[in-house]
Amino acid sequence: MSSGGLLLLLGLLTLWEVLTPVSSKDRPKKLGLCPPRPQKPCVKECKNDWSCPGQQKCCNYGCIDECRDPIFVN
């Protein structure tokens, strides 16, 4: 590959990195722990903590992903 091609590739990669939106994976998790698993059918209510309102966390219980108020353990 020519030096011009390498510079173009480097420029495109840099631009892609700058323009890539911040994903939820880069955000810190919310404080607290998820409460015990609820007894209910499978439901996918959320994808991550930031898809839940307020202080609620996206809690995964196998086939259940739902927004729940966190519990805090000392």
Swiss-Prot record:
Pfam hit, one: WAP
Signal sequence residues: 1-24
Keywords: Antibiotic, Antimicrobial, Disulfide bond, Secreted, Signal
Assigned protein family: Belongs to the venom waprin family.
Record's protein name: Porwaprin-a
All copies of domain WAP, residue ranges: 27-71
Tissues where the protein occurs: Expressed by the venom gland.
Entry-linked PANTHER family: ELAFIN (PTHR19441:SF30), WHEY ACDIC PROTEIN WAP (PTHR19441)
Gene3D superfamilies per record: Elafin-like (4.10.75.10)
Disulphide linkage map: C34-C59, C42-C63, C46-C58, C52-C67
Compartment(s) where it occurs, according to its Swiss-Prot or TrEMBL record: Secreted
Cross-referenced InterPro entries: Elafin-like_sf, WAP_dom, WAP_four-disulfide_core
Single GO BP term: venom-mediated disruption of cell wall in another organism
Domain of life: Eukaryota
Described function: Damages membranes of susceptible bacteria. Has no hemolytic activity. Not toxic to mice. Does not inhibit the proteinases elastase and cathepsin G.
Gene Ontology CC entries for this record: extracellular region; extracellular space
GO molecular function: serine-type endopeptidase inhibitor activity
